[in-house]
UniProtKB/Swiss-Prot annotation:
This is Serglycin. One of its GO terms (cellular component) is mast cell granule. The gene is Srgn. Keywords: Apoptosis, Biomineralization, Disulfide bond, Glycoprotein, Golgi apparatus, Lysosome, Proteoglycan, Repeat, Secreted, Signal. Plays a role in formation of mast cell secretory granules and mediates storage of various compounds in secretory vesicles. Required for storage of some proteases in both connective tissue and mucosal mast cells and for storage of granzyme B in T-lymphocytes. Plays a role in localizing neutrophil elastase in azurophil granules of neutrophils. Mediates processing of MMP2. Plays a role in cytotoxic cell granule-mediated apoptosis by forming a complex with granzyme B which is delivered to cells by perforin to induce apoptosis. Belongs to the serglycin family. Binds to activated CD44 and to GZMB. Residues 1-25 form the signal peptide.
Length: 152
């Protein structure tokens, strides 16, 4: 039995389209670095797009191992962790500055508050931070004033 030429063409075209759509394509093996260099001049950016030479990419599909294959990640936390928390906020120094303003208080500020809120706890030679703030004792002067005394 003879198959018409038109049917063969349609069959071949359908085969090529189906087979071609299932192929994902070959990944790119060549790459090029690109960057933008700008020299601002007043209100203008004066940018130039530059391209580096092309180079071959290495095949990284074989370099990817199973999850958690890295022995450093599997060890867990280090046993010889040294905390610099004891040195935090201590020391001496000098400085200069200028400004104007007025205020009152005992001098406790941001660093003192941080030391109250983040107290280290030592469990089996590993330093963890307890992020639950302690109850603060507000014994400083002018801390417990009612809102009626505020001047807006």
């Amino acid at each position: 039995m003879q198959v018409p030429v038109g049917s063969r063409l349609v069959l071949a075209l359908a085969f090529v389209l189906v087979w071609g759509s299932s192929v994902q394509g070959y990944p790119a093996r060549r790459a090029r670095y690109q960057w933008v260099r700008c020299k601002p001049n007043g209100f203008f950016a004066n940018c130039i797009e530059e391209k580096g030479p092309q180079f071959d990419l290495i095949d990284e599909s074989n370099n990817i191992g199973p999850p958690m294959n890295n022995p450093v990640l599997m060890e867990g936390p280090s046993k010889d962790f040294i905390s610099n928390y004891d040195d935090y906020g201590s020391g001496s120094g000098s400085g200069s500055g200028s400004g104007s303003g007025s205020g009152s208080g005992s001098g406790s500020g941001f660093l003192g508050d941080m030391e109250w809120e983040y107290q280290p706890t030592d469990e089996s030679n590993i330093v963890y931070f307890n992020y639950k703030p302690f109850d603060r004792i507000l014994t400083e002067q002018n801390q417990d004033q009612p809102e009626d005394d505020f001047i807006i």
